[in-house]
Amino acid sequence: MPRVPITKEGFERLKIELQRLQRDERPMVIRAIEEARSHGDISENAEYEAAKEKQAMIEGRIQDLCQKMGECEIVEPSDNDNGRAIFGSTVVVEDTETGEVTSYRLVGPYEADVQSGTISVVSPLGKALIGKEEGEEIRVQTPKGVRNIEVLEIRN
């Protein structure tokens, strides 16, 4: 199975979340379940049901994080400034139709978050940007439709 690229920072964020869930959230929900059980009949105990649901969500997220972390390969962004967009690069682009300028950091799929300015190298835009140089124009199909993009700046 191919490894999933991730930055060192992205892997650390996954690790911190996993530790928080295991160290803080899991024991807290176990105590809540025990407390709800102590109230007697659990068949009609809303507190018990809510705690069990929360426990299932926490355990599911822990399992998800463990799986993702096992699939990851930490990739250090290259210091090779060949002028092309690569994994870890920050790319400033302009939508040639709207004039909107946006900055994206190219990262792995497990750390991508458009709201914080990171996009996955396997997303349509991420794939289109990999290997491009400043001044190049690309046409890319996105969920919002076809966009014409000019690469303004690349920082590796």
UniProtKB/Swiss-Prot annotation:
Q: Which domain of life is it from?
A: Bacteria
InterPro entries noted in UniProt? GreA/GreB_C_sf, TF_GreA/GreB_CS, Tscrpt_elong_fac_GreA, Tscrpt_elong_fac_GreA/B, Tscrpt_elong_fac_GreA/B_C, Tscrpt_elong_fac_GreA/B_fam, Tscrpt_elong_fac_GreA/B_N, Tscrpt_elong_fac_GreA/B_N_sf
Which is an annotated Pfam family here?
GreA_GreB
Q: Please verify whether the record's keywords include Methyltransferase.
A: no
For biological process, the GO terms are: DNA-templated transcription elongation; regulation of DNA-templated transcription elongation
Instruction: Write the record's keywords in alphabetical order, separated by commas.
Output: Coiled coil, DNA-binding, Transcription, Transcription regulation
Report whether Iron shows up as a keyword of the record: no
Question: Which GO terms label this protein's molecular function in UniProt?
Answer: DNA binding; RNA polymerase binding
Coiled-coil-forming residues are 44-67
Read off the PANTHER family from this record. TRANSCRIPTION ELONGATION FACTOR GREA
Described purpose of this protein according to its UniProt entry: Necessary for efficient RNA polymerase transcription elongation past template-encoded arresting sites. The arresting sites in DNA have the property of trapping a certain fraction of elongating RNA polymerases that pass through, resulting in locked ternary complexes. Cleavage of the nascent transcript by cleavage factors such as GreA or GreB allows the resumption of elongation from the new 3'terminus. GreA releases sequences of 2 to 3 nucleotides.
**Family the UniProt entry places it in:** Belongs to the GreA/GreB family.
What is the protein named? Transcription elongation factor GreA
